[in-house]
């Protein structure tokens, strides 16, 4: 399943604080990263159970509380709706974090595609923001 590969990719390439946008009910990546020593923040527009080892915040990425995201090395989202892609990238740009988006099959955005151990996702590095 792609979630393990994405957790491995993040663990191999990032340190410290990471933020998952729109965590929903699929908390495996956040929980795996927390177990690996990451400071994991998770957000959603509705109240959710905080994944083990994570901090949860109700936040709307289209009207974000930037304090939640500040200091993150990576902001990532797993299968967000395409209408949120630009908001996720914009929050990442504003706080100087890399941005990783794993879209639903067939969703497209203008960004570099990474194929890591069979998991495909978009990655925008902080140095590539306009």
Curated annotation (Swiss-Prot):
Disulfide bonds: none annotated. Gene3D superfamilies: Vaccinia Virus protein VP39. Pfam families: UPF0146. Transmembrane segments: none annotated. InterPro entries: SAM-dependent_MTases_sf (IPR029063), UPF0146 (IPR005353). HAMAP family: UPF0146. Belongs to the UPF0146 family. This is UPF0146 protein AF_0739.1.
């Amino acid at each position: 399943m792609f979630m393990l590969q994405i957790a491995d990719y993040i663990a191999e390439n990032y340190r410290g604080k990471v933020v998952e946008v729109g965590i929903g009910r699929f908390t495996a990546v956040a929980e795996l990263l927390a177990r690996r020593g990451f400071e994991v923040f998770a957000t959603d527009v509705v109240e959710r159970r905080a994944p083990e080892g994570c901090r949860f915040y109700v936040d709307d990425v289209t009207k974000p509380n930037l304090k939640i995201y500040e200091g993150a090395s990576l902001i990532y989202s797993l299968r967000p709706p395409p209408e949120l892609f630009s908001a996720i990238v914009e929050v990442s740009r504003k706080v100087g974090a890399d941005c990783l988006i794993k879209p639903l099959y067939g969703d497209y955005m203008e960004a570099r595609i990474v194929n890591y151990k069979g998991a495909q996702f978009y990655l925008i590095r902080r140095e590539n923001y306009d």
